[in-house]
């Protein structure tokens, strides 16, 4: 795998709107220049398309058939432009959840590109044509897509796990606002028990090499909180220094891998002694509840 900077796009500041502002923590990239990136494998390509202030859309391309899917296309024109640039056939929309900053472009995109199948796990998803639930499967070209039901951030949240039969390349998972690099989404419509199941029992059981493509660029702030939870974790400090360098270059910190998340993400590490001690409990689910509540009120330090 390698990354190639493709284009520079300015953050769309002020477009997010009141609804999406409610759902997002303080953005790190309000006025920064952010680059899209292309992750290339022999079986699939994934183009990271920055959107709004800190969102990511993902153009998933099957290399065998040149069929494509778009994940959370909140800025439809950027999607249309990327599809034309790659010369692929866009047939599918993968919606992780109904919040405006993820599903808010669906209606416009289906007008710009008629005939799209729009997948999602919630009737609140705009332009929905195919409602899915846990372990539903379908194809994007020759790629296999498995739906993973991960309720908590919203009650209908779906992550999409993508593999290619007989491929030696790493799988991909598009996690929306369930799993971030070094973090997880707020529990707007769920409980600590549900997030524990989503992170540990569902996403955490994917192959460790699985590449994690999340919904937002929150990595630096997440790692600063992780450092607060585990001040002696050198992996966190190293990852934070790396993320700051990426930020300074306007580059994404995505993807991570499932294996990596278990080394620096406090919400994936709720069974670790250091995290349990920080939370003052021996119960991982109570630790999940405690550190999520703590992070909701966490004042991010400058350094």
From Swiss-Prot:
Enzyme class: hydrolase
Reaction equations catalysed: an S-(2-hydroxyacyl)glutathione + H2O = a 2-hydroxy carboxylate + glutathione + H(+); (R)-S-lactoylglutathione + H2O = (R)-lactate + glutathione + H(+)
Positions that bind substrate: 186-188, 216-218, 292-295
GO molecular function, one term: metal ion binding
EC number: 3.1.2.6
Binding site for Zn(2+) 2: 101-102, 177, 216
InterPro entries referenced in this protein's UniProt entry, alphabetically: Clx_II_MBL, HAGH_C, Hydroxyacylglutathione_Hdrlase, Metallo-B-lactamas, RibonucZ/Hydroxyglut_hydro
Necessary cofactors: Zn(2+)
Residues binding Zn(2+) 1: 97, 99, 153, 177
Any one GO cellular component localisation term in the record: mitochondrion
Cofactor stoichiometry and binding remark: Binds 2 Zn(2+) ions per subunit.
Keyword Hydrolase: yes
GO biological process: glutathione metabolic process; methylglyoxal catabolic process to D-lactate via S-lactoyl-glutathione
Keywords of this entry: Cytoplasm, Hydrolase, Metal-binding, Mitochondrion, Transit peptide, Zinc
Pfam families registered for this protein in UniProt: HAGH_C (PF16123), Lactamase_B (PF00753)
Role of this protein: Thiolesterase that catalyzes the hydrolysis of S-D-lactoyl-glutathione to form glutathione and D-lactic acid.
NCBIfam families registered for this protein in UniProt: GSH_gloB
Family: Belongs to the metallo-beta-lactamase superfamily. Glyoxalase II family.
Subunit composition and interactions: Monomer.
Name recorded for this polypeptide: Hydroxyacylglutathione hydrolase, mitochondrial
